[in-house]
């Protein structure tokens, strides 16, 4: 699946807004059965459904919003001192694999640390994986960016 990762690149630290590297597990699956484009805030559905008109309204009001849509796979680090515990804990950083607006370009860094996917892709992945399954986030071959694909 093509994905989008952090605008700030890779990194482990809280507040960095970077995508963490290394071995993780799926801590929780959130949104099972929710309609495509359902909006989540703090891992809870708001009851809203994303549309370009809603996004435009937010823009006109001068508001910005990081749209977390459709499904959430909440990640937890497995490597103490690397992505688990302390100031580098992936779970406490609220790093997810989640859906985003269909207009969002994949394979271009743009998130605040999460891994964004197309909504239909995140539903497909969500249905294929179980809580506790491993996720390995690695650099691409040129070692300058996170690989912008997920293989299930």
Which residue ranges define each predicted feature?
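Histidine- and aromatic-enriched segments that form or immediately flank copper-ligand environments
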Residues: 1-7, 88, 95
